[in-house]
Amino acid sequence: MTDRLAPATLVFREDGTLVSPAYGDIYHSAAGALAQAEHVFLRGNRLPERWRGRRHFTIVETGFGTGCNFLATWAAWRADPSRSERLHFVSVEKHPFSREDLRKAARHIVAGTTIDASLVDELADAWPMLTPGLHRVELDAGRVVLTLAFGDAREMLPSLVLRADAFYLDGFAPSRNAELWSVEVFRALAKLADEHASFATYTSAGDVKRALENAGFSYRKVEGFAGKRAMLVGEFAPRWKLRRHEPPRAFDADTRDAIVIGAGLAGCALVERLAARGWRVTLIDRHAELASEASGNRAGVFHPLVAIDDNFGARLSRAGYQYALSRWRAFEAAGHAFSRSREGLLQLACDEPEFVRMQAAADALGMPDELASLLSREQAGEQLGSETAQGGWFFPQGGSLDPTKLAAAACATAGERLTRLANVEVARLVPREGGGWLALDANGATLASAAVAIVANAADAPRLAGLRHAPVQQVRGQLSMLPAGSAPKVALPVIGDGYLIPFADGSALTGATYEPDDLDPIPREAGHRENLVRLAALLPHAQVDSNMLADPASLKGRVAFRCVASDRLPLAGALGDEAAAAANARALSGAQPRDLPRASGLYGAFGFGSRGFVWAWLAAELIASQLEGEPWPIERELAEAIDPARFLLRALRQGRVG
């Protein structure tokens, strides 16, 4: 289970210096936090000159604290007309401040300086929920990307996937927080370093110098800040080979263009994330409209999963949920609307034993209320506006939305960078001479050509990409539309074994059946009946129209097909080269994911099951980051859990390839 976070406590000394009661140390010099950041970390890393003319520049920091180093760097980047296109700032923090404490601390730091206080508010407004793991925060219209790693540096740093250009070695003094300055931490940083990546730190302690040298960094002493005799600067310059695997680089292509096949949420999220980085995208779909298949329901629900062991599925859903919310807020701020409900979402326990398990998870995980809180039966009924048989989880930022409108909003943000080919079916993907991919129709005619191809067309993706080791199946789901006046009256979407989504006109949506390998596209009376029985079990005290129960065939409905992987996790990322793996199967029998050969320029995003809302944007951001050589938005172990080549890897380890 992921360790719960212990937030920092905001305490000021009489001289206005921030202090940590837990470590008995100050957050910054009494001579000025921002001046210290500029002297030690910016000048110490030869910034801003080193980021000039770059597509992106990546800084890794140990100890976010009050954010003063980040704010100083952001301000310097904004002021530089020759700045990099994008600035990535990745920071590890074991004890993050709450949103409002961060706002107070940062406002105090920038008061009386040249830094615009609006930067503090933009940062605080985007500050994530205090949950363990990685959090992607996009600022300055997406040009500045802050990736926060909440947790112990010794655990978080090895989980990062990135290539660092500079390191800010901050944090409390080595005498107060020795583990942050250990050989273990510096070796983890060394695995992330680009050739000759720089570092700077305010300390010149002997143990720190020895640990840096041990990890492959060279150093020299320079004048410290505010009368401090010395500080250390240096670079990654190992005298021996330290790394089995090199940090990731950007995909090598002459052009930044991609073919995305499938215009559901997975494909439209990819369009948005790639276009935001300047890529040109051709979106191909066999239907005339966006989101016409599994993403085409009138509404769907979104919420994270909660599990007492905080397994991969729970962690991925939490990360995807929070990242999706941040992207949707950006769409809404730009004027796009997609009927996102605002009342929250209620997940009811099916019975008393399940509620007891929920209580155990709540006690073990200690989640912040803005993520989820556990309500008693009485509290749940009050929240829902209807009596319930059990309590359950309340997700205040969960809810429902219109997937078709969301897909349209995502594509609208791409503007002229998007080319749509509708009513077109891709029969084959073939390698392009000289690199890249061609999408061909059934007659062999070229539909599109690009450096990169991404299959996001659900259950047909393995066929199109030529994957033998991608076990997905189609699961039929039938939902039922309940006419106005016939549905139970509830104040917000409610789920359990089934769901009910209310609409403003008094109608509602309920469902859905779960029928593996049933490919009948026509709604059936039996499906409506099953949905009504499930609704009655979900809300046993609610009134359901007796006429509807007597004649379920009178209901309107819709059938869609979920694409579900055998391990119930999505497939997102670079696809494996199965032919190359088969040719080298014996050598790869003990391989790690990073050892597998990959099909150059071929990626996938499919197998989202019923969780397209939660997983689509995280998967798209992961793929875009892989293509650009940017820091990944999730931990390595989570990326490997959804790696499309994971099934190939298992087959190799079991001797089933070749």
Spans of features found by a protein language model:
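The AdoMet/dcAdoMet-binding core of the Class I SAM-like
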Residues: W51-A164, V183
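Helix-loop-beta segment of a Rossmann-like dinucleotide-binding subdomain
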Residues: T113-D116, I308-N311, A337-Q347, L371-A412, ...
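N-terminal Rossmann-like FAD-binding beta1-loop-alpha1 element of flavoenzymes
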Residues: R256-L283
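Glycine-rich FAD pyrophosphate-binding loop
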Residues: A276-G296
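Dinucleotide-binding Rossmann-like beta1-alpha1 core, especially the glycine-rich loop
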Residues: G300-Q383
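Flavin-dependent oxidoreductases
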Residues: D310, G435, A439-V533, L538-K556
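Helical element adjacent to the flavin cofactor pocket in flavoenzyme catalytic cores
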Residues: W393-A442, L447-A448, V452, A456
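C-terminal catalytic lobe of FAD-dependent flavoproteins
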Residues: S546-G658
